[in-house]
């Protein structure tokens, strides 16, 4: 399903100056290092600001494409849920068709669209003979409550998401969890990314941070909070219900792939210091591929790494209300080509990076490596939070190369 709606425009592009206009709000970026040269504009995708990165030779390239507001129905049948007649539904597909949601989304798009609801735990009983559960792009998928992929180190399956697929949640309690030993294979393309967003975004209502939960990926990587003797470890991850655990001894573990994926309008605070991020990586290993990913307008952190050693490239983190990049628990991965921009309207923002070691015996530190990163702040400043570039706290080190912090005079720069 290809639904393209452009909502972010870049004009006046050069290596030193670029004007970004988001939702009719503009911010002028006065400085851009050559490594972060913005040449073109992302082609926005499926239902809203799906910023599609086309990186080449170390640049983050943002390319402007044609606007296509059409819906391509690849089903070949009449997809409308329980609207009478032949629905064209695949009875072997995961989840249940919702006639209500199908009707709401169909009305918004002006043509028949099938919405299937995913809930509970998806295991081998829901998979094909190869242990794969596939979300196709001829259906829109809704999350209802926590949706777990596999059990922890049991009933392991792979969730395969086709390019151009749209997934949404309706409340902060709707989120996706990939359990240890299960995988997510979410591989979009530059012209047809995978979109995970809110119901409001899908139907064209008012959008904002915190309209659904987010994505949680759990792996078998190391953590400073795990026993350092290599014995069993199962740490409860922030934001998710009990049983969503991570940790182990394998920093090369693979949880699958996220490529050309956009997560928007997510984040949810269960309690202080217990929140869902746009994407949470708990003990995720370096065998996982993360490339060309955007998190936009999240109510908490854009991405957070709890231990592990997963690497990520071509990250775009825009208008997130807390830290854009957060790490702790001994995270040791590599991040390259990272672009952070706080909200253009100077609304809620915090740090471009917040790094911690967070616990353990004091001997193990977080030690990530970052190269080619730009942070553009805004003027947000309150007693509790303000727009800052970098904060490194207890038990963390970091190697930073080609790192730029810029923005208005009010922005906090760096604190170590």
Describe each region flagged by the PLM.
Residues 2-47:
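Bacterial Sec-dependent N-terminal signal peptides
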Residues 52-55:
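C-terminal motif of bacterial Sec signal peptides marking the signal peptidase cleavage site
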Residues 57-413:
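Beta-strand/loop edge motif enriched in small/polar residues
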């Amino acid at each position: 399903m290809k639904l393209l709606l452009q909502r972010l425009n870049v004009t006046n592009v050069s290596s030193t100056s670029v004007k970004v206009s988001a939702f009719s709000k503009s911010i002028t970026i006065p400085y851009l290092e050559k490594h972060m040269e913005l040449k073109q504009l992302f082609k926005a995708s499926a239902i809203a600001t799906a910023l599609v990165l086309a990186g080449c030779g170390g640049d983050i390239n943002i390319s402007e494409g044609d606007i296509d507001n059409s819906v391509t129905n690849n089903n070949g049948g009449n997809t409308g849920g329980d609207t009478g007649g032949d629905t064209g539904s695949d009875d072997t597909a995961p989840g249940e068709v919702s006639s209500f949601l199908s009707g709401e989304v169909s009305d918004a798009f002006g043509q028949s669209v099938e919405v299937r609801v995913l809930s509970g735990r998806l295991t081998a009983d829901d998979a094909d003979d190869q242990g794969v559960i596939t979300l196709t792009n001829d259906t829109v998928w809704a999350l209802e409550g926590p949706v777990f992929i596999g059990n922890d180190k049991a009933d392991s399956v792979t969730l395969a998401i086709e390019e151009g697929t749209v997934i949404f949640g309706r409340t902060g309690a709707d989120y996706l969890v990939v359990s240890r030993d299960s995988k997510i294979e979410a591989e979009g393309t530059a012209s047809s990314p995978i979109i995970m967003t809110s119901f409001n975004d899908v139907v064209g209502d008012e959008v904002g941070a915190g309209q659904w939960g987010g994505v949680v990926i759990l792996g078998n990587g190391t953590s400073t909070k795990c026993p350092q003797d290599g014995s069993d470890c199962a740490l409860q991850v922030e934001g998710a219900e009990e049983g969503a655990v991570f940790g182990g001894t394998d920093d090369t573990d693979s949880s699958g792939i996220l490529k050309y994926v956009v997560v928007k309008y997510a984040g949810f605070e269960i309690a202080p210091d217990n929140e869902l991020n746009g994407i949470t990586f708990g003990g995720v290993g370096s065998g996982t591929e993360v490339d060309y990913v955007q998190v936009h307008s999240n109510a908490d952190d854009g991405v957070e790494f709890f231990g592990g050693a997963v690497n990520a490239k071509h990250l775009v983190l825009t208008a997130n209300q807390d830290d854009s990049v957060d790490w702790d628990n001994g995270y040791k991965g590599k991040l390259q080509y990272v672009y952070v921009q706080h909200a253009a309207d100077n609304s809620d923002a915090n740090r471009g990076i917040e790094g911690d070691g967070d616990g353990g015996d004091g001997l193990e530190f977080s030690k990530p490596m970052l190269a080619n990163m730009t942070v553009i702040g805004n003027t947000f400043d309150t007693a509790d939070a303000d727009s800052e570039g970098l904060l490194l706290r207890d038990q963390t080190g970091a190697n930073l190369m080609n790192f730029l912090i810029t923005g208005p005079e009010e922005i906090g720069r760096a604190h170590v």
